[in-house]
Amino acid sequence: LDLGKTPLANELQPARGAKFKQEIFDLIVGKCDDCMHIQLLTMVNPSKFFKNYPYFSKINSTTDVRFQNLSSSLDRRYGERNDNFLIEIGSNDGSLCAKFLSLGWRVLGVDPAESPVRYALENGIDSICDYFSSSVAENILDKYGLPNLIIANNVLAHSDHLRDIFLGIKLLMNNQTVLVLEVSYGLKVFENFLFDTIYHEHTSYHTLFSILPFLDSYGLKVFDVEQFDAHGGSIRIHI
């Protein structure tokens, strides 16, 4: 699916009159015939998105309600330890971590966006400003130990280094650790013509058909899947 050349979706232009050269990039979606994974064929350096990332989770009231419901639900299901510990990959400004913190969890966020992470730290959310990777996971393991819950909401769409991300996730898991992933549901993207969700920051579009074998290759077994309406249609995968 060739959508031509477009500028970056979240690249804000300066005030009128300032000189600004806006780059454009190919926006082409392809599907692998072997594994059925759907992704962009041209990848943009992620520093162009995250160095001056404008999005803060806290500004979205709908997201706040969803985070409140999610934290309460996951606390009931998986908050069985006396020392519950959450690691959130793609934690942004710490809004979801803060919900768990109020429930008595120890929390750690990891996110590459400087301004949201700075906000999280200023508001008492332990956070690492970096792209999550196997090397970051090793450092977390040494300093913090194993969590009993890992959350990655809308993270997998934003990276073309999924294998290293999952190597890192595996390092932080044992038999008692639960991983919860949220992804925009690729089936709904194409079934409902959600073309506005296709832009350079979203490198991948996931379906269960493609993601289940991928998870299985890391020995990760899915035991529950929820479908909900966020972002035009999403799925939450419990592993």
Task: Give, region by region, the residue ranges found by the protein language model.
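Conserved SAM-binding strand-loop segment of SAM-dependent methyltransferases
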Residues: 124-139
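Conserved class I S-adenosyl-L-methionine
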Residues: 82-92
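N-terminal juxtadomain amphipathic helix
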Residues: 1-62, 226
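A short glycine-rich, Lys/Arg-flanked "PGG" loop and its adjoining helix->strand segment in the class I
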Residues: 163-178
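A conserved beta-strand element that flanks and buttresses the S-adenosyl-L-methionine
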Residues: 148-151
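Conserved SAM-binding loop of SAM-dependent methyltransferases across substrates and taxa
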Residues: 93-104
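Conserved SAM/SAH-binding beta-strand->alpha-helix loop
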Residues: 113-115
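Short, glycine-/aromatic-enriched active-site segment of Class I SAM-dependent methyltransferases
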Residues: 179-204, 208-211
